[in-house]
Amino acid sequence: DILENGQINKKINFKNKKVGFSEPTFVIAEIGINHNGDMKIAKELILKAKESGADAVKFQTYITEKRVPKNHEVFDILKKCEISFENQEKLFKYAENNDILSFSTPFDKESALFLNSIDCPVFKIASFDTVNHNLLSCVSDLKRPIILSTGMTNISELNDALKIIGSADLALLHCVSSYPLYNFNAD
């Protein structure tokens, strides 16, 4: 997949979209949890993403109790923003009916398996989960394309993640996970 001049020449199919060398830029509208758990807002964000020309929308799929303990300071916020699996499936269908690709970041094995059951075309792995070997193994075993963020990852951790993921169709995202971004952190 590497050309002699050092350019990557691999293309990955995200359902009906090709991503990779010589393909148009693939624009993802990050909805995440910005819907605040409100289906009406989530649907509005899908429509706005479509209107803006985005190729896809991305959500976060999780079970709050598996992410943080109940006494954690962000538990209530995450719980409020959590969308049930049933409603997440409705959002995927809503996006499909509006001709925009949807996918998600699973934060636990159950969420990954649910996303697989609704034919999620690609899995996005958050930077902090690059070291979550159980999640990486689960997602890799599902044989779908993976987008792996590397913002909080050193080279050794990245190599370990790549060994676990194996030969899956993979897109690496280099990002800096500090906000605001100071010039000395930009590379």
Pin down the residues of each PLM region:
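Catalytic cores and adjacent flexible loops of soluble metabolic enzymes
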Residues: 1-187
